[in-house]
């Protein structure tokens, strides 16, 4: 049986495919353009850190704390935007990246930095909106060609441009949320980490999602 498994792994590698990681957190980038909501970009985090720990299943976006004409006039207070499952199901998953633990930690630090009350929580429609938030996350996981000045108010177009410019670095998804979510299995259970605290800064070995402020959509 073991020789057969080795052969399957070798064939997958020769064909340019990587076998699924046993434990890693995947970041998936999403856009939402349907219904009565404003266009929006956000990302989900799903999986288990390589170093061990509790399963991660969370999502983060960035938006104005309140929607008003003041958005058009200048900076306003911003907040993290945590989408409900129904909102995610009505969105579009564009692409994903399997992160290292260091990248995962950096993304959590980004989320914390943009949390309500922090210096980066100021929302500016022109240069500090939801697209800029996912842009920074994409930068932290090693993607390039992220500066797309004409697309920074167009979440779907922006993410599709990033996908096209990062072939080989990302896993294309391009599926409607409901279908994509249905294709996912359960988040892998933590392996041995429940018996030992994580050694990676910023990763908490509990059953809770990452400890950052949340605001339900």
Regions found by a protein language model. Give the residues of each.
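Second-shell loop/turn segments in exported
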Residues: 29-32, 90-100, 115-125
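Glycine-rich catalytic cores of cysteine/serine-nucleophile enzymes that process amide/ester linkages
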Residues: 24-93
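Sec/Tat signal peptide C-region and signal peptidase I cleavage site
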Residues: 17-24
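Stable alpha-helical elements in mature extracytoplasmic
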Residues: 38-41, 91, 103-110, 126, ...
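Activation targets extended, charge/polar-rich intrinsically disordered C-terminal tails
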Residues: 113-217
